[in-house]
From Swiss-Prot:
Function: One of the primary rRNA binding proteins, it binds directly to 16S rRNA where it helps nucleate assembly of the platform of the 30S subunit by binding and bridging several RNA helices of the 16S rRNA.
Coiled coil: none
Gene name of this polypeptide: rpsO
Organism: Marinobacter nauticus (strain ATCC 700491 / DSM 11845 / VT8) (Marinobacter aquaeolei)
GO cellular component: cytosolic small ribosomal subunit
PROSITE patterns assigned to the protein according to its UniProt record, in alphabetical order: RIBOSOMAL_S15
Entry keyword Ribonucleoprotein: yes
MF-aspect GO terms: rRNA binding; structural constituent of ribosome
Protein name: Small ribosomal subunit protein uS15
Pfam family, one: Ribosomal_S15
Any one GO biological process: translation
Length: 89
């Protein structure tokens, strides 16, 4: 269910702002989005998995907070990120 190390490395490489950047909001949101998408596929097959659903809701809330922070600090980077990830708003 979790992302493999190679998938994480590819996402970090695609969204990092500089070499070795793993903590920028863009990278964090991209990783959360990938995890959320994987969990959504999991729930199509496992509708009764309420324990994991709680984790999904937590990830969605964390992503929302990071997106709100990025929108406050740098609206241009925010708009570029949601366009690249295909998120609404």
């Amino acid at each position: 269910m979790a992302l493999s190390a190679s998938e994480k490395a590819q996402i970090v490489k695609d969204f990092q702002q500089g070499d070795g950047d793993t903590g920028s909001p863009e990278v964090q949101v991209a990783l959360l989005s990938a995890n959320i998408n994987k969990l959504q596929d999991h729930f199509k097959a496992n509708k009764q998995d309420h324990h994991s659903r709680r984790g999904l809701i937590r990830m969605v809330n964390q992503r929302r907070k990071l997106l709100d922070y990025l929108k406050r600090k740098n609206a241009d980077r925010y708009l570029e990120l949601i366009q690249r990830l295909g998120l609404r708003r």
